């Protein structure tokens, strides 16, 4: 089995796709198809989840509780002013490039939404 990294960048420009990405991440995390499923948030997705509705928040809480969410980019979270909201949801903030490099080094399969 492979390890899977989902990079979610889609945000308010396509909220339906952003919700699909979150739901897909949750389903993959629960499926047992992979050794490990991790999610990185980057760009507009951070603004989307930082201002999310109750349904989206519930999906995020479940992803966090499954230890699926690795982090969101600290620089982007600051840019959008959502760092407190993200950390309150249990999402760690870290430099995106460093986190991505660590998963590439570990040979995770990468899918971007």
Feature locations, PLM:
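Short, glycine-rich nucleotide/cofactor-binding loops
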Residues: 5-19, 44-52
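Histidine-anchored nucleotide/phosphate-binding helix
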Residues: 17-31
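Short internal beta-strands
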Residues: 25, 36-43, 70-76
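N-terminal beta1-alpha1-beta2 submodule of the flavodoxin-like/Rossmannoid cofactor-binding fold
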Residues: 28-29, 33, 39-52
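A glycine-rich helix N-cap at a beta->alpha junction
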Residues: 53-83
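A short aromatic-anchored loop/beta-hairpin motif
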Residues: 62-63, 80, 87-101
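C-terminal binding/interaction regions
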Residues: 105-112
